[in-house]
C-alpha cells in the first residue's frame, strides 16, 4: 500500500471503501488484487479539491462517474475495476495507459504491480496529476503529454494497454505497440455508450477479440494536443 491512512480516513472513508468493494463483488468483480486496490486507494482525494463540494465527496465511494475538470470525469469504480480485471495484470507488466485523467486508474495499475507509462492530452490534468500521484506515493509512473492515438512507440512494446476514453475505432498504432501475448482493453463507439473490446495479440497479424458490455466514456479525441 502506498497511501498512509489518516485517522479521519480510517474512521470515515476506509469504511466507505470496504462497502464499495462489497458492491463490486456483487456486480461480478472477483480479482482479489483489483478489490484490494479499490479498498486501498483514497478516491475522495482524486477530485479537484479547490472546487469539490461536500456532496461530491459524499459520493466519492458510490459507483458513479464524477467530474474532475477540463470536461473530463473519473470513471465509475466498476468500470475501472472491470477494465483492470480484463487486463490480467501481472507484477512487473509494462502497461501503457491512454488517458491519465485524475490518475485513479493509474494508481490502480501501480497497486497491481505494473510499470506504468501514461499519456494525457489535457495539459491542465497532465500538469496536476504528474505532481499529485507522486505526492500520494506513486513515484514509479512515467507521465507523457501527447496524443493517445499515437501511443508511445519509443517505449514499446507493452505487455498491456488500457484506453480510458471512448474511441471510434482501435488505433493501429496501439495494436502495433502491443507485445505478442499482450492484451489491450478499449471502449469502442461514437454514441453515448461504447462497447468494451478486449483483444489478445496472438501474433503480429492475429488478434483474439471479445466484446463485453456497454459503458459510458468521454470521447477519445485525435490531434487535439
Descriptions of predicted regions:
Residues 86-208:
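Conserved nucleotide-cofactor-binding alpha/beta core module
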Residues 2-96, 104, 112, 125-127, ...:
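Class I SAM-dependent transferase core
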